[in-house]
Amino acid sequence: TATLYIAPTSTIGTVFYRVMYNDPLPGCGDGNSNNVTVTVSPDISITTQPTGLTECADGTATMTVAVTGGSGAISYQWQVSPDGTGSWDNATGTGSTTTTYTPPSTVVGTRYYRVLINAANSGCDQAITNVVTVNITPDLSITTQPTPIIECLSGTSQLHVVTANGSGTITYTWQTSPNGTSSWTNASGTGSATPDYTPPSTSTGVLWY
């Protein structure tokens, strides 16, 4: 019955409102206002949490978040922290204000990320994702190069390589060439997909690996 009315917002959905007016003095008449709608939307709900990742320096892996609910335009702000518990700063890089983010990968180390999600219209609570870890590791490198072999027929000498760093499972494929510069093909024999390879020695000659 007042000139200002605060519509209930406890029930999700759309309700139509109007105000009726009446002047008790004779001849002043009565009537009603235009109809207006009040739409109550559910709060933002995170349906897909971002997943942490481990990659080599200069990688381009992405993290993604998805939500439902909210009212009006939904905004996203990825944030980064050195420890995941203390201070948070707005992140930089491709997609830092979108649902899909590519964290910087030029600096080796561990950093922690989360996303702040807000709806443009009033009344919707801010949503914050879980904290995820991003590990940037040094690129794969060879610390021990294979060395040449000179052996007799039916010898069992091995070629050996040692690697360091990298991310995930390291795979090895030994290759052979008749001249060391071209026509490289995958080698066969014991250990051809491991760090320790025993090249075939059933015929004389020189091969490159």
Give residue ranges: language-model regions:
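Solvent-exposed loop segments of extracellular immunoglobulin-like
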Residues: G69-V80, A164-T176
